[in-house]
């Protein structure tokens, strides 16, 4: 179905499969620019309903026009992630953005221990966000302070984990699936999971597969969205 300028202004909900090494902000900017170019308009509202780190891929909900007023609804929905933790080592950012800073034993870790430990994280838990995060404190992003080497106290927050399962074990790497509430940091889950194992861990891969009832397998790549947008342009020019 051909989408018009009015369709985008009245509001569209776009499902985009964010690639690795893109920020969520870059995806929003790219789509906004393409929509503006397609319809030769100066301004249109475009926003996302929940950020993904550059080192994560998967589902982004992008809202346009009047639909941006509903972003908070999508932000509040449960999210599903799959990915991997690397056991036996930690990093300051809790993922691959920074180098390993400490190594820990893993010889005692068994499949039984792994699966028993997941149970500690189900339900409402207290979680501290990573120091390398976009959360603001005293007007500054935490990652700005972290990159300057400044230390700061971070308060724990209540988050909810509905499901947490280990899907594959190939030590030191384990694969997982998590269903969690808004505000949950999977990087922090990796770090805390490592501590609970009397070891260490960091997030080595992450993909968001669901937000509420929206699934990543229904999402477009950025390239496919742009192609269909301009294909609509050609169709509309040839339609009598």
For the regions a language model picked out, list residue spans one by one.
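Catalytic/RNA-binding core of pseudouridine synthases
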Residues: 1-240
């Amino acid at each position: 179905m051909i989408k018009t300028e009015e369709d985008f202004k009245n509001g569209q909900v776009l499902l985009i499969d964010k690639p690795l090494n893109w920020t969520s902000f870059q995806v929003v900017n790219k789509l906004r620019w393409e929509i503006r170019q397609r319809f030769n308009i100066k301004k249109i509202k475009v926003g996302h309903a929940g950020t993904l780190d550059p080192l994560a891929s998967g589902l982004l909900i992008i809202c346009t026009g009047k639909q941006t007023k509903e972003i908070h609804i999508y932000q509040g929905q449960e999210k599903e992630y799959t990915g991997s933790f690397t056991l036996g080592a930690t990093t300051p950012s809790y993922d691959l953005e920074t180098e390993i800073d400490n190594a820990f034993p893993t010889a005692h870790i068994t499949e039984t221990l792994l699966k028993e430990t997941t149970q500690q994280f189900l339900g409402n838990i207290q979680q501290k966000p990573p120091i390398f995060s976009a959360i603001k404190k005293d007007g500054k992003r935490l990652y700005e302070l972290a990159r300057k080497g400044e230390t700061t106290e971070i308060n724990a927050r209540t988050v909810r984990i509905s499901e947490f399962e280990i899907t594959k074990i190939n030590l030191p790497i384990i694969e997982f699936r998590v269903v969690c509430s808004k505000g949950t940091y999977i990087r922090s889950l990796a770090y805390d999971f490592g501590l609970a194992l009397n070891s260490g861990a960091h997030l080595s891969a992450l993909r968001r597969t669901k937000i509420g009832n929206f699934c990543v397998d229904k999402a477009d790549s950025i390239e496919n969205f742009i192609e269909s947008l301009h294909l609509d342009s050609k169709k509309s020019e040839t339609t009598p």
